[in-house]
Structures are given as C-alpha cells and as structure tokens.
A protein has these predicted regions:
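Active-site-proximal, substrate-binding regions of enzyme catalytic domains
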Residues: 25, 47-74
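General small-molecule cofactor/ligand-binding pocket signal
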Residues: 39, 76, 127
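Active-site neighborhoods of divalent-metal-dependent phosphate/nucleic-acid chemistry enzymes
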Residues: 74-116
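A general alpha-helix detector
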Residues: 9, 47-51, 85
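Acidic, PIN/NYN-like endoribonuclease modules and their adjacent C-terminal/linker elements
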Residues: 2, 72, 104-138
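Short, well-structured N-terminal submotif of metal-dependent ribonuclease cores
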Residues: 1-40, 54-60, 121, 133-138
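Structured helix-beta-strand junction loops
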Residues: 34-35, 72, 89, 122
Length: 138
C-alpha cells in the first residue's frame, strides 16, 4: 500500500516536534514494518525545507537531514497536470489540493495528516498518525 505523508507529519519527525513526534515516528516505523511504501510529493519538499528553517538553524545540517530522509521515501511527481487539476478541487488551501491531486494521480491508498479537516474530499482516505497506528494494532 502506498501512503502519502503530509508535510506536517514529516516536519514533526525531522524537527522532533512535541507532542507529535512520537506518533509520527512510530507511524513511519509501522509503515516500514508492514511493507507499505511511504511517499512524499515533490512539491512538499520545498515546504518542508522552508518550515524546518525554524527548527534547524544550521543550513548544512538542515539540508543533510532532509536529503537523508528523502532516501527513505518515494518522491511522487508534481507536474503541470497536477497543479492545474488541483485548482479544480476548489480547496481553501491550495497546497492541500495539490497533495490530494498527487495522491489521486499516484493511486495512493491514504494520506496521513494531522489536518484531516483540510482534506474534505472522500476521494482518498485520510487518517491521523494515531488513528493509523490504532487501526494497525487492531
């Protein structure tokens, strides 16, 4: 199963943001343990680097951290088709629309995010890290 990790989940892991780090880190380990494929949209990478500047001051350390993390996930393309069709979703938050469009184009089974309300579509299932972990433990 391919699982798209939303930007907030990746930042939680890389910045070790409390109180979200523990569930997000456990989520990533569970995804690997169950042979699922963790995915990140190419468009999210710039957002991740930008947000992490608040948490990791040293530029080299920041970039190395992100580069190392990206070796662990599949990076999904964000194309002209993706960004154009994301407008048609009519989301309040365009970044979330792009994430959903990437998910649809790549046959993603679910999106893991802390902001489920931002993904008001039922096209691709969304879950919080905690809900995903509870489901996997059941």
């Amino acid at each position: 199963m391919k699982i798209l990790l939303d930007t907030n989940i990746i930042v939680d892991i890389l910045a070790q943001r409390s109180p979200f780090f523990e569930d997000s880190f456990k989520l990533l380990n569970t995804i690997y343990d169950q042979n699922h494929i963790p995915c990140v949209s190419a468009s999210a990478v710039t957002d991740i680097v930008y947000i992490l500047r608040k948490y990791i001051a040293d530029k080299k350390k920041l970039l190395d951290t992100v580069k190392d993390f990206l070796k662990l996930v599949a990076i999904l393309p964000t194309t002209q088709h993706t960004v154009s069709n994301a407008f048609l979703l009519n989301f309040d938050d365009y970044e979330d629309a792009v994430q959903l469009q990437v998910a649809m184009e790549n046959k993603i089974s679910r999106i893991i995010t802390r902001n489920q309300k931002d993904f008001r579509s039922h096209i691709v299932a969304t879950q919080t890290p905690k809900a995903f972990l509870q489901e996997q433990e059941a």
